[in-house]
């Protein structure tokens, strides 16, 4: 059987376009978050969402502890937020100066295109990641549309 080097696989998968999100939770020490792009809708009945967390992600045990998290879909122009929440900064520093509000106890980033609130149902091992399955408890967002020559 042929094997593929991890670097080759990563390079090939870099051609797959995906959205960028920040997964957030409200821990006992305050809001926490991490950038994630391995996010997708899993089921409509029941409403389930899937997020992949690196096993070493510092946000993972905090989400596992609270059992609640939010997925903030970033808009064009929010690259700085994506980089900030992907950084190795301590969790308590990531939210310093970041405008957000709490919706049902879940941090929602100002300017996010959309957000989904979830209750963590299951964490499934998947190699060097954990696959988080969340039951959707809230969803908000207004898409930017182009119709008949103007934004709507």
Residue map of PLM features:
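Basic, polyanion-binding surface patches
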Residues: 1-152
